[in-house]
Amino acid sequence: MCTPAGHPSHTQMNTPPSAPLERRAFLLRSSAALAATSLTGFPMIGSGKDAVQPLKIALVGCGGRGAGAANQALAADSNTKLVAVADLFPDKLSAGLDALKAKHGDRVDVPQERQFVGIDGYKHAIALADVVLLATPCSFRPAHFEEAVRLGKHAFLEKPVAVDAPGVRRVLAAAAEAKAKNLKVAVGFQRRHKKGFQEMIRRIHGGQLGEVIYTRAFANTPLRTGLVRKPEFSELEYQCRNWYYFSWLSADFIVDNLIHGIDISNWVHGGYPVRAHGMGALSERSPDYGNLFDHFAIEWEYASGARLFGECDRRPGCWASVTNHVVGSEGKADFFDGREVYSITGKRPWQMKTERGENPYQSEHDDFFEAIRKDLPYDESDYGAKSTMTAIMGRMAAYSGKIIEWDAAFASDRTLAPEIRSLADPAPVLPEGNGLYPIPVAGKTLVL
């Protein structure tokens, strides 16, 4: 269900029992028509159009990352406007919209009839824009991207792009259609837009380290606070609000966080692993922290025989590191996210300092909107989807305790993300009698 923010839904109105479906359909048709009418004279544009033409932006998912992406999109091109927003929850929508209005003023042109709340809100927001920013929990990303491509919209997809192999395949299929339509597709791997990372990769590919033997990636950061349940929340609403701690919504920490380091390793190797094995667990269970592991240690193997050793650790009080390291036959390269110094040691040492304050989150949107304006080739979907799949394969290995082959993982039909039609639907995972959620057990949990 989708309802314009601030408007009563059919369940809140005094109507006969036979009326809800008709009334909901009427509301959706009326709100969409009103929203479209209010944009008359503000024409849709495609790729490579005159920069004088304004670009209309829609934001789907108004939380912190979504509002951040909208802020960067508006900063990337001065002739853009945010014209529609959608979110599951009215409070999240309002908070994100208020923050954007405070910074960008009348460039945030989103009256109430273009604020959409509910499961289907994305459809109405996407229809009103030239460019869409997809920043909900990643279980919804495949469906949202499919809709954007169907309607011919350029799209920014926050990472990860899916929670399971069926979702990855859906994204790749939609990406093929996007390419045929000359749509620009960006994925939120901002490190690929950092000058220091780009230069380091160029040198590694040029042979400055000799043959790459292995890479290491760390995403060891403190645990964020879980959401305390309120009495008025249904089980599904609670999980959607506390999405970070449920694998069907976030894909688990290894996919949501370590994915950046995994993507850097794939970039270094110029391909994707053929298999993975490893382990993970949850050290301390709590009702507020869902059904995720809090640490992983995975080894991925590439076709060349090179390895990626990855760690993701969210346990409090443990060693923290967000870094990538590349070891070759003739040297070593160290990537420190957030620092401005990049270095290679070994036979051909090198060091580079980049401008302090470089913001890769902004750079990725600068590059994206430049490609739209100039009709440049721009498609980050392939590595966006396949680096997501690499991370999912690592999660499969930890959950199962098995060696997981790429081909089997990619072909798997086992899904974490059910189709949700309403927040009244049953939740995909339920707490046990002690209030704790069941977690995977290596050696017993099936992942293929």
What would you call each of these model-derived segments?
Residues 33-105, 265, 445-448:
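N-terminal Rossmann-like dinucleotide-binding module
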Residues 130-131, 138, 142-193, 207:
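Beta-strand-loop-alpha-helix segment that lines the small-molecule cofactor/substrate pocket
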Residues 29-34, 38, 68, 260-273, ...:
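C-terminal helical cap and adjacent loop that interface with cofactors, partners, or active-site loops
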Residues 103-134:
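A structured beta-alpha segment of the ubiquitous adenosine-cofactor-binding alpha/beta core
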Residues 1-21:
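N-terminal secretory signal peptides
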Residues 14-34:
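N-terminal secretory signal peptides and thylakoid transit peptides that target proteins
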Residues 61-65, 180-186, 191-290, 298-300, ...:
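Predominantly a Rossmann-like dinucleotide-binding segment in NAD(P)-dependent oxidoreductases
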